[in-house]
Amino acid sequence: KLVKQQLDKVQIQAEKSAPLSFVQESFKSSSAGILMFLTLIKRYGIDTVISQSNYPGTSVINKASSIFCFLALKLANRRRYSSDDTWCMDRGMGLFAGLNVLPKTAWYTSYSDRVTTEMNRSFLKQLHQLWMKFGLLEDTANLDFTTIPYWGDDAHLENNWSGKRGKALGSMLAVLAHDPDSGLIDYGSANVLQKDESAVVLEFLDFYREGNKKKDNKLRYIIFDRKFTHSEHLKKLDQDNIKVITIRR
């Protein structure tokens, strides 16, 4: 019993995040596989887009490493990162972001509060240009709404239908644009209000054209649910030579 009690009390303190000095060393990691993505990130110049973005850095962690911290969790499939923070001791995940270890959970919350919609939209436009440059976007886009549940005080949020849960709940309504050939998510917004739902397809079209410097509009088809927008907006799409494929549920 005494041994068990002593083991229960053992707590390992994670190191504080700091820029990596890149001295020769060896360590074990359960998430070293995410380092394979660095080759793709470099090949397509995504690291350059991140460095040129408007995202902030912190006093200790620079802009690029800050974004790579979020990428590390996403690529390692850490969905509920606040309930199990053993990842902040994994040296491999820290190496991915150019740090000794990833910062703790509170850092992510604090950083997210500093990120604005304008920063995200500007970043998406830069990525859109990148995908076009490398021919990763074809002439078709899938558009769909998704409900993001909010488990805190949701009095300030609208009730949106969640097909996954089979009910309406206080949540954020987001829209995603997906390229069916490459699998890329080309556009996204989590600020959709119910009164603006039907205009989202036109907002996506504006985004697509604003992010295309060469003005060679490759987009020809948009696929969405039949209730996604109304007839007036469908007429505008037709005038822009955009064909619509609707899905009946």
Roles of regions detected by a PLM:
Residues 146, 181, 227, 248-249:
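Anionic group-transfer/hydrolysis microenvironments
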Residues 213-216, 233-243:
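Short, surface-exposed basic-aromatic patches at helix termini and helix-loop junctions that form
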Residues 165-167, 242-249:
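Acidic, His- and aromatic-enriched active-site or binding-groove loops in soluble protein domains
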Residues 1-167, 174-194, 198-214, 238:
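Dynamic "connector" segments at or just before major functional cores
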Residues 144, 219-220:
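Short, surface-exposed recognition loops or helix-turn segments adjacent to catalytic cores
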